Amino acid sequence: MTLSAVLTPAEEGGFVALNPETGTATQGESAEEALANLREATELYLEEFPLVKSGGTLLTTFEVAERA
C-alpha cells in the first residue's frame, strides 16, 4: 500500500512527519529517521483501524490572507 508523507523541518532540529490519510505523526533527527518512524507508527495504527478503500488522495494547496 502506498501512502503519503509530509516532512517538515522542526524548529528544534530534525523533522516532523505526517501521514494525511491516517493522521499519524512522528518525528526524527533526520528525514530518513522521521519517515521510518512514520512507517512504523502508521503500520501500528492500521492494525487497529484499517483504511476504507477510496478513490485516492488529492494533494493540493490553498492560500490564506496574511495578517500583520
Give the positions of each predicted feature:
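Short aromatic-glycine-(Arg/Gly/Cys) micro-motifs in beta-strand/loop hairpins
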Residues: V6-E21
